[in-house]
C-alpha cells in the first residue's frame, strides 16, 4: 500500500493525503488496517463509497466479475502474541509457493468498480467465495477458471 500511495496520485487524492511529504509509512498503514479490523469499519466504508457511486449512477449492477488476488506475506509474519497469524496459510500458484492471505473481489462488470471484498487465508479456493461476491441483482456473472 505504501508503494501504491507513492506511485499513484489518484490513490493519494482519494485518501486525502495531498503531497508526497504526507505519505504514511508501512507501520502507520498496518496500524490503520488493524483499527479498521478491530472496529469492523472496512465493510462500512466500502458500503458508503458504493452508495455514493450508485447515487451518481456509476454502479450499474447488471453484471459482476469475480476474482481473487494473493496477498503474500513473509513466512515469519507474527501476530501480537508473537505466534504465527492463524489467518495466514501457504498456497501454491503456478509452480511457486506463497504464504499469506487472499482478497476475493466482486466488481461491477461495466464500470469495474469494486462492490464486494472478502478476505480469507491464501489456501481457500476461489470458487468457495463466489457466492459471497455477488449481490443478487446481476443478469450475468463472470469468473476465471480459478
Identify the function of each model-found stretch.
Residues 3-6, 15-17, 21-146:
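Polybasic low-complexity intrinsically disordered regions
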Residues 9-10:
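Short alpha-helix boundary/capping elements
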